[in-house]
């Protein structure tokens, strides 16, 4: 439930921990790095009413001993973030989301739904293989000395073949940088040798 502050539907956040009848099957995981935009801080929480899961997790915790000290210090300081921090970050993500989604959907052959939460989207591209495309962008493509880095969406699915023409893109950059990335992405799609026609999607 690490994205609970970033729900864009206007609906209230309801924790899975409050759903009746599934108590023994519910595991809540929280992360300081997601909630407070502190990339790399490996501090969080795992909460469950299932004693068997708690016992198994405790073994991993005892083997690890403790998270890095700096991460703990940063995490503790983050807990004191004022409420306006969340409002400001939320408002900024709403603007960045609009910038990225509108820009993606203007590129021929690209489609991105409007995410209802978090700070990333999964966009469908007119390409043969997202793993190949993402690697090609990093290793073989540049436009005016720049390229784009995306995550192949296939790694986020368990169904074989799912996400083969999708990429995950975060809108954590400033809007000017997102707009520039959209220009570079459009140029990459024009040049990519594995581009496919829309009907092949």
Where are these regions (language model features)?
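PLP-dependent class I/II
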Residues: 1-201
């Amino acid at each position: 439930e690490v994205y609970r502050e970033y729900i864009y539907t206007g609906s209230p956040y309801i924790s899975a921990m409050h759903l009746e009848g599934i108590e023994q099957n519910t595991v809540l995981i929280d992360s300081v790095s997601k909630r407070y935009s502190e990339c790399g801080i490996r501090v969080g929480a795992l909460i469950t009413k299932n004693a068997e899961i708690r016992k198994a997790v405790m073994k991993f915790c005892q083997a690890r001993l403790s998270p890095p000290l700096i991460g703990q210090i940063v995490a503790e300081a983050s807990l004191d973030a004022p409420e306006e921090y969340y409002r400001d970050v939320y408002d900024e993500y709403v603007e960045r989301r609009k910038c990225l989604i509108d820009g993606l959907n203007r590129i021929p052959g690209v489609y991105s739904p409007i995410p209802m939460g978090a700070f990333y989207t999964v966009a469908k591209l007119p390409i043969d293989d997202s793993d190949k495309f993402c690697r090609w962008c990093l290793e073989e493509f540049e436009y005016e000395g720049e390229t784009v880095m995306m995550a192949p969406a296939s790694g986020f699915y368990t169904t074989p073949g799912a996400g083969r023409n999708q990429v995950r893109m975060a809108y954590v950059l400033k809007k000017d940088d997102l707009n520039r990335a959209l220009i570079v992405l459009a140029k990459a799609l024009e040049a990519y040798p594995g581009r496919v026609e829309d009907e092949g999607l």
